[in-house]
Amino acid sequence: MSATVTVVVRTRNRPAMLTRALASIASQTFDDYEVVIVNDAGDEAEVREIVKKQKSAVRSKITIVTNEVSKGREAALESGLSASHNRYYAVHDDDDSWHPHFLKKTVAYLDEHPQAGGVATRCEIIRERVRADGTCIEIEREVLSTDNYGLSLVDMMVENYTPPISQLIRREVADRVGHWDGSLQTQADWDFNLRLLADSPVGFVDGEPLAYWHHRDTMDASLGNSVVTDAYLHKWDNLHIRDRYLRTMLATEDPSSPHLGQALLSAEYYRRMREELARVDSGFHSSLNLVHVDMLNTMTALHQQVHELREEVTSLRAELASVSQIKRSVRSAASKSKRAAKKLMGRG
């Protein structure tokens, strides 16, 4: 099987999500692709049953690769790339989805920009809740990294702000810089993006989000998003990657090399900046607490004034009612006096 794009779908025992992912891929307006489903030690019969339910035009594009023993999320991608060698590839995990024009626009970009090692699109985070049957209910949406209008190595060195679902990669460049590091449990996509951007520019298709990164706020690792369920691993793998690159830089240097001194200086300034931010944050919260106390005191005083005003209004109403009663009594007496006077005058 040969096509322009290889779409690798990593999955493991999430049939409802895999069904949704295949529907997302089948909806693409660009259809010169093949799909490699990497079943990472999951129920293969279940995967085959889901594939069997696809329309023949889609089913004919699908290859299933089953790892008898789980290789883990990051290493599973290599199983898919080993099974297909097309010009471009995308990672469409079973829990994410695409806009119908994702492949159309990203393929067009790479065709028009041969120097680009890849391209990314604007991405939207979809927060959802998992039902008992494994299907999901959307809760809210949020556009990711709205202040970024492209991909740069400078920004990528700070953090990974481009999830795999939003990228299309040129295969020959990936082969040159090296694929995902399967020894990592998380962050292999960030590590790859660093090497990719160090080698080649990566384009960006702005505008309407064409990729949807689904998040589920659950600690169930089988259903959750790794950003939530493995947050601590993301932190430590990030540090591990940074340490590895720093060691590589220093490996050929004399122990007294100025490069280590420069790195330590940067780390010290970072430490000081973090302490200063913590101090400012603490001062801000202290000021906020003072404002809060002042507002509470003001509100208490206002409530007391309102209470007193209500009592005054009640008292005034009582007085007005009394005055009204007196007026009615006076009018009644005056009326009786007039009638009596008329009677007396009539007798005379």
Segments (PLM) and residue ranges:
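Nucleotide-sugar donor-binding/catalytic module of glycosyltransferases
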Residues: 1-240
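Boundary detector for helix-to-coil junctions that initiate low-complexity/charged tails
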Residues: 242-348
